[in-house]
Amino acid sequence: MRLAAIASALAILLCAAVFGAIFLQRTSVSGPAPSPALAAPGEEQASAIGASARVDAARTAPGTTEQPMVVAQAAPAAAPTTCSNPNGLGVARTVEIDTTGGPGFGFEHFKSHDFLREGEIVLTFDDGPWPKNTPNVLAALAAHCTKAIFFPIGLHATYEPGLLKQVAAGGHAVGSHTWCHQDLSKTKGKCLIGGKTQAYEYDPKDEIEKGISAVRWAVGGPTAPFFRFPALRQPQELIDYLGKRNIAIFSTDLDSFDFKMRKPEQVRQSVMAKLKKHGKGIVLLHDFQHATGEGAMDLLNDLKAAGYKVVFMKPKFPVTTIASYDEAIMKQVKGPVSDGRPTSSVVRTISE
């Protein structure tokens, strides 16, 4: 029994020795797979960038025919818009407008683009920026977390550039409404300049372009290729001109006629009655008008209570200005003396 047990043990040891020798031989030829090393903080990213650079360098080396590799990167996610007002109108839908060819909007003049659904409205404000009235409109829009299109007058923009910057900073679209709010079917009129009404002769195209350049200067950044004719008087040759400039033309579906009203409740009643009749539409208001500024909050409250939804129209690309008009505006707003220095380097608050 003992001899048999000893023999079995020796056999097991012999087999183990044989298999161990085979294993050692194999590992000495191929070697074990290396364990992945943990990168120190920052090393992993640097390595990935380096590898990408080497691949790109190899692909774009002189004499190679292979095209460079383009790596698509996801755009940063937009920060969600929060509204502290649970009863705010908000923005139900945002639409992007390709202004190529100068499309027209507003069924009072244009019938091509019926994109609004029942109960949807677009808020638009003309003739600003103007002290007190425009800030009241902006405050109401902000309280309701909603957006609008503004069509400022170029001359007003040069008076209140800081105010127009606030409009743009609020996320609203900023179009234009000529330089001095003239009837573009004519070439003579009157313009309120420096607090005085003066006889005024003009070229209609100059009126359009000076207004665009003035608004762009006042905002200090991109503005929308959106235009509205004063008094909605739209000569065909200027419609064609704006089409070549790729600027969309805005008429209206619902004119509030707030410029005829002195009381905020009249403006509200006008808008709500017309919406009840039409059910949807582009609404024309004026942030220049006191009654509209004073009643803006109540009007938005009424729109919310009635279940209307705001659609925000934003441009696919910004408007382009014409250099000669930009230069003319700069001469007008800066005067004959300008050293080119920013105001912050000339005027500094040292006590307050």
Where do the PLM segments sit?
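Active-site-proximal beta-strand/loop segments in catalytic clefts of secreted hydrolases
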Residues: 125-128, 151-155, 177-180, 228-232, ...
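C-terminal domain-boundary segment and adjacent tail
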Residues: 109-115, 144, 158, 292-352
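Short glycine- and acidic-rich boundary segments immediately preceding or forming the N-terminal edge
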Residues: 58-99
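Hydrophobic alpha-helical membrane-insertion segments, chiefly the h-region
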Residues: 12-24
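Alpha-helical scaffold elements lining the catalytic groove of polysaccharide deacetylases
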Residues: 133, 182-219, 233-279, 292-294, ...
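Active-site beta->alpha N-cap acidic-glycine motif
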Residues: 82-199, 203, 207-216, 221-224, ...
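N-terminal Sec-pathway targeting helices
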Residues: 1-12
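Juxtamembrane proline-rich low-complexity "stalk" or linker regions positioned immediately after a signal peptide
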Residues: 27-73
